[in-house]
């Protein structure tokens, strides 16, 4: 079923039971299988499998929504973002280069570039929760299972292995060190 005013561009593949709301734009090279897309939503060059996408949400380009993913309304799932068996609540954003696996992400959460939910330990998968309003900085690893509290702020480059309290700033990274003359002593980059 395709709603009134929806535009579907060439090279789009719709498989199985697909429902697309009104006034959507489905861009070229998109594949949607057994999924529901809300109203006024834009999907650009992406793959959506057995998932739900809310109203006024933007997906892509080059996003991958794997089975059992649910994206709320007013969300952004940008380029090279993969979401698996997870929920992004209303207003959440994962703009680029992010992996969200087996997790629940609250309302108006911002996931910075390069955020990875580390959900698999080699034998079991674990689930994490990020509460409403949290800000997760660029290149953060959330080693599941962890719980990030409401309005918490996780600093860029951190690896999170413990829960983060509501409203807290969490920084987990080593102090940088510059070793002068190291390149020359090792003979690296000789011209």
Residue ranges and their predicted role:
Residues 1-171, 176-177:
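Structural signal for interior beta-strand "rungs" in well-ordered beta-sheet cores
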Residues 179-191:
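Short, charged, intrinsically disordered terminal tails
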